[in-house]
């Protein structure tokens, strides 16, 4: 044996002896804990090194240690959306993917149909990102925020609630609340300019509350109600937590004044939903008992004055819980609250943007009015039927191109649970994938003159052959929006009611608007229009 080998063995023996002496001074529990920590650090460092290696191969701005791109993102709220879109234009135009670091967490931004499809079209990536965690106190594990098996189970339960025949029952609600909106707008006749957004938002809040819970909250008549204020307040706080890194810690957030407001809003929202669920269950129990006493198994479909009763989303959930599906009161509340959250802001944005764009383009507005005249004639009062709404094909094209330019949800986020090849780049597990809907819809290869409002983009002949992931205002793939048919019908009902009574003229110019890319894509200072009655 050579002297070098002997020397090496002696050195290792001395080292092991020293380590043994050090370890012998600690208890077995301490040694176990220290060993576990060491193993964790080694494994974490190995995985982290692998993640960084792959992420850094994706184009993107230089990042600082620990801070990532926080300095570039440390801008006013109304500038943040523009900054993110600017990064996409600067770093990702060639392959449709770029990356940023939020602190030590990587995010990839996707904005080409070919890079979006691998995420949205896979059952492997149905889990939403951590940005949705701030909705959990309100929505629990409803359809929007649930993951994996629970999401699959809930989706299966809820799909029948959006069947075409069920949606037909909601048309009367759309019409009645749209008529209230038209009456409320009458006070603005003669005004040089007013913000359309708040009027529409209160209308859609009335619609979604009545269709979700079967209860009227009269938001359009009483915008100061505690429930209405809570809906607005909780949305604002969620957006604040998403934008401000320090508020993303539950502990730090619990020390702020916003936390007390947050808890107050949650108590109001949950209290109202729980009350409605209890009352509705009691009503249905009485109806069932009366039917049994009358030896009649058919449901009592009429109220005391002979008017046909309307099913609400809540009723369908209660029925599902009776038919063997395990849904507790809390489960039902989660889904009702989710419907409330997803169903009012998104549709109000779509309606407001469409009316505004039609106000910018009177030539398209007149084509819509001609279509409405062909359906209703000179009649401005008769409510629309399901068939009437289905016949509003050009109006639907207008809504779709409005959603192309101003998608209600400008960004969607998913967790990458395993490595995936996107655009020739490996996106490692643990990354957040951000689908940039706003940028995706402005692809000149798909939509010539992408910044121009052009409803003809959605005529049947122009849609033929289009990539299925080039236009996704309601997301796409297995986790697409379950309520998209509901939304389009509601939007048609509201917009057609307004346009049958008023001519709309945009006061603001599109190029002067500042966009806020929050949970919902909003104009910072509203959408100012003027209206005149139609003869």
UniProtKB/Swiss-Prot annotation:
Family matches, as InterPro entries: Cyt_P450, Cyt_P450_CS, Cyt_P450_E_grp-I, Cyt_P450_sf, Cytochrome_P450_Monoox
CDD domains recorded: CYP4V-like
UniProt keyword list: Endoplasmic reticulum, Heme, Iron, Membrane, Metal-binding, Microsome, Monooxygenase, Oxidoreductase
EC number: 1.14.-.-
Binding site for heme: 342, 481
Cofactor names: heme
Membrane topology, as annotated: Peripheral membrane protein
EC main group: oxidoreductase
Cell compartment(s), UniProt: Endoplasmic reticulum membrane; Microsome membrane
Gene3D superfamilies per the UniProt record, alphabetical: Cytochrome P450 (1.10.630.10)
Protein family: Belongs to the cytochrome P450 family.
Function: May be involved in the metabolism of insect hormones and in the breakdown of synthetic insecticides.
Name of this chain's protein: Cytochrome P450 4c3
Species annotation: Drosophila melanogaster (Fruit fly)
Biological classification of the source: Eukaryota, Metazoa, Ecdysozoa, Arthropoda, Hexapoda
């Amino acid at each position: 044996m050579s002297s070098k080998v002997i020397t090496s063995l002696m050195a290792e023996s001395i080292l092991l002896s020293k380590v043994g002496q050090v370890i012998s001074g600690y208890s077995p529990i301490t040694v176990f804990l220290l060993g576990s920590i060491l193993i964790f650090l080694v494994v974490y460092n190995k995985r982290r090194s692998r993640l960084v290696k792959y992420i850094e191969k994706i184009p993107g701005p230089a990042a600082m240690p620990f801070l990532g791109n926080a300095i570039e993102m440390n801008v006013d709220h109304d500038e943040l959306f523009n900054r993110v879109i600017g990064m996409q234009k600067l770093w990702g135009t060639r392959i449709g993917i770029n990356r940023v670091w939020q602190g030590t967490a990587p995010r990839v931004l996707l904005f080409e149909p070919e890079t979006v499809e691998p995420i949205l079209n896979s059952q492997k990536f149905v889990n939403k990102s951590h940005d949705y965690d701030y909705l959990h106190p309100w929505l629990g594990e409803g359809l929007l925020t649930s993951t994996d098996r629970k999401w699959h189970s809930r989706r299966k339960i809820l799909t029948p609630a959006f069947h075409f025949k069920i949606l037909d029952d909601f048309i009367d609600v759309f019409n009645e609340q749209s008529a209230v909106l038209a009456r409320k707008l009458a006070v603005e006749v003669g005004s040089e300019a007013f913000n359309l957004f708040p009027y529409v938002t209160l209308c859609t809040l009335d619609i979604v509350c009545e269709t979700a819970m079967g209860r009227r909250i009269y938001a359009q008549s009483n915008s100061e109600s505690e429930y209405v204020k809570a809906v607005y307040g909780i949305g604002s706080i969620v957006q604040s937590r998403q934008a401000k890194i320090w508020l993303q810690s539950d502990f730090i957030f619990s020390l702020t004044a916003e936390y007390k407001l947050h808890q107050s809003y949650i108590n109001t929202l949950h209290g109202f939903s729980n009350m409605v669920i209890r009352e509705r269950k009691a009503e249905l129990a009485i109806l069932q008992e009366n039917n049994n006493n009358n030896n009649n198994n058919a449901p009592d479909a009429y109220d005391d004055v002979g008017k046909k009763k309307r099913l609400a989303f809540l009723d369908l959930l209660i029925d599902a819980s009776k038919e063997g599906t395990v849904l507790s009161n809390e489960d039902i509340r989660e889904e009702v609250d989710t419907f409330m959250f997803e169903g009012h802001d998104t549709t109000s944005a779509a309606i407001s943007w469409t009316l505004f764009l039609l106000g910018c383009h009177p030539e398209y507005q007149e084509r819509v009015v001609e279509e409405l005249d062909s359906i209703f004639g000179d009649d401005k009062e008769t409510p629309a039927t399901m068939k009437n709404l289905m016949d509003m094909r050009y109006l639907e094209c207008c809504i779709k191109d409005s959603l192309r330019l101003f998608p209600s949800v400008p960004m969607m986020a998913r967790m990458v649970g395993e490595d995936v090849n996107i655009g020739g780049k490996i996106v490692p597990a643990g990354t957040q994938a951000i689908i940039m809907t706003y940028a995706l819809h402005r692809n000149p290869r798909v939509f010539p003159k992408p910044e121009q409002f052009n409803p003809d983009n959605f005529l049947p002949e122009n849609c033929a052959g289009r990539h299925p992931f080039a236009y996704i205002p309601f997301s796409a793939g297995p986790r697409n929006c379950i309520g998209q048919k509901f939304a389009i019908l509601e939007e048609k009902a509201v917009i057609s009611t307004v346009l049958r009574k008023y001519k709309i003229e945009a006061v603001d110019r599109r190029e002067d608007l500042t966009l806020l890319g929050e949970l919902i894509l909003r104009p910072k200072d509203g959408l100012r229009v003027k209206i005149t009655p139609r003869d």
